[in-house]
Amino acid sequence: MTGRSRWRYHFPSEDYSSCQGVQLDEGVLIWNKLPDKFAYIKSLVFTSNCQDGTPLYSSFVELEDECPYLPIVAFDWNSYINNDGYTGPFKYSIYSVIYSVTANFIITVFLTVIVFINVPTKPSRKASYILKLGALLASLNLSIFVIRVWKNIAENYTYNGYVSSTSFLNLLWGDKVFAGIDLVVVFLLQISQVQIVMRFFDRMQEKRMVFYFGLFLILVTQILWVIPTLSPVPTKDSDSDIDILPPFVYLFRIALSTCYASVICFHVLTKKSLCFRGRMIFLTLLTIFTVFLHPTFFIVDVSNLWIDDLSEIFNTTCYLASTVIVLEWTNRIHTMERKIHAASVLGRPIYEDEEQNFHFAIYALRMQNAMKMHRDGHVHDHGHTCDSNDNANVSLQNANTNDSSSIITDNSSQRTSTFGTMATDQVTLHTQQGERNITQFKRAETFWNKCHHVLESIVYYTDNVMVNALAGSKTFDSFTNDAEKLLKTERLRKTVGLDEPEDVYLYRKTTMSSDSVME
């Protein structure tokens, strides 16, 4: 029988006399394979049907016309099925194992179908490709394993007339392909859980920190877990250095699942006005149940040996359920929040780190120019009234200062070029009536420019920090001074912003009245 990790508790094995052989006295042996179907035997050693030192017989009700068991065999069989040990009672039989594995397989396939056929509304977010791949691999892995189990059970029952739960456990524990695919599935589902936790935070810096920290913990857990899983099983008399690794990693997995459940429950408490409203009550309770099912299952796995035997199958289903159901719950909560933000006056909160490539500022300036164009066209349609008002404003501005004429000419010239500005995606000059915006936008750098900047930084710090610290700065006196001067000049131009002359700078001019200053 394939053994598990030695850190778990194992019930002491009992010795059954019927499995070791029973000396029978002389008598008549009736056997179908004998020439005359029966024979007179003076002495015979009878060995019962046993596997791994435990008897194997049918638990069905015996018929009255059947031959009874030998007294020693009947005694061993009754003591085996009635003791409180491991694999003896009916709950450890093959029937309970088959029912549990089949139900677990159906739940996994059901969750996989939900992942693929669920079409969320537009504000929601569909399942990621990582979650889809993990769910698909989990279903395929369990499907192949269940088919192998059914085939093995059918063959054993056909040729032997009995089926033992130990044969199923040997097939589960000895299948390295199943264990390897299961590790990949758990890794993908844990990545999906990290993505769900990232959605609970609004700032990009917080999301980035959650992703890096979660990915680090997942990699450490999977690397430590794969070592004892794929390593040879130690024997009873041998000592191994990796015996301490499985319990440590198992406790680490319990801690990770508990942290995930704590984050979900904290988010439920912060959004309790949305979580416990109408149809969301049932989904919220189901979410809490699934996230707490995983740490509870881990704890029960340590204390219950029957769950310990099937832990690799149950763990995958728990990971998948705590990911798929929480994702659906998160989508609905975010949909309700966006509806509330859309109905409010201020909308949703916007943070500084969301302003990447100045999308909000560019959008605001374009909308401002569009409104100004619409207003100018409306004024032009009204005819002489608007023209007289503009002429009056021009005369007042000419009387106040000499610079106002340049402002008006600039405004008129830029009104004619606004259509060209809106047609291109480049950031150009945006103006308002009577003022200018002081804005400078950074242009998105190409990939090769970023690589060039990284290479320049590496060369700079290598030359000036590492090499000078080891060999001294006088070692590089043989190089030409012109190249160093050009390099310093280029850095200075980059520091003050002169390396990008095509960037547009907008300045704001205001007119001041001398009367207001004197007052």
UniProtKB/Swiss-Prot annotation:
Residues 1-96, 148-176, 231-243, 301-309 are extracellular. Belongs to the palH/RIM21 family. Required for the proteolytic cleavage of the transcription factor RIM101 in response to alkaline ambient pH. Keywords: Cell membrane, Membrane, Transmembrane, Transmembrane helix. InterPro entries: PalH (IPR014844). It comes from the Eukaryota. The keyword Methyltransferase does not apply. One of its GO terms (cellular component) is plasma membrane. This is pH-response regulator protein palH/RIM21. One of its GO terms (biological process) is cellular response to pH. It is a multi-pass membrane protein. The keyword Transmembrane applies. It is found in: Cell membrane. Residues 118-126, 198-209, 265-279, 331-519 are cytoplasmic. The chain crosses the membrane at residues 97-117, 127-147, 177-197, 210-230, 244-264, 280-300, 310-330. Its main location: membrane. It holds the Pfam family PalH.
